[in-house]
Amino acid sequence: MVFDFKKEYKELYKPKAKPSIINVEKANFIAVRGVGDPNAENSEYKQFISLLYPIAYAIKMSKKGDYKIDGYFDFVVPPLEGFWWQEGIKGVDYANKDSFNFISLIRMPDFVTKEVFEWAIEETTRKKKKDFSKVEFFTYDEGLCVQCMHIGPYNDEPITVEAMHEYMIEQGYELDITDERFHHEVYISDVRKISPEKLKTVLRHPIKKK
């Protein structure tokens, strides 16, 4: 059976549309970093996320080649995720998207080591005749967070974020966004196929005890 992160880790990919507290364990990702409005034409965001999928599929499809990965199992490539922040702002200013910094990520199974990642970069560069040097191997220990499934357009996220923060305070926590802990989005829906009103996005904010 093909391993599906969305089914095996429902608490991470299918939370309810009401806030909850979760402890997210350390995981490996492939990632790209950039800046600017993600919706702008020819944005770094649109250009860079297209670099992630060939690497993810090279690892997934390695089963058909000569390169054998220790502990390999077949898997569904997980949803795209994103860390977002703006310099000098503790949170997200949706009215000033040009100042966004981002790390876009796709989670990888634990058998994906730095060595496996480097093989995938080399193999994909050779096959695609394209530069994948912006893609990096990224290990992240997210820790304690408040999260909620946001249903609707991205521009309506502040409504869900406000509910998350109210719940967080009620439970005795406070926001802990820092230089290493970010506003986190997990894109469950394919924006190309679903109307904005039905988009599902997991929103996650780092927290700490008061």
Regions found by a protein language model. Name each.
Residues 1-210:
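A solvent-exposed interaction/effector surface
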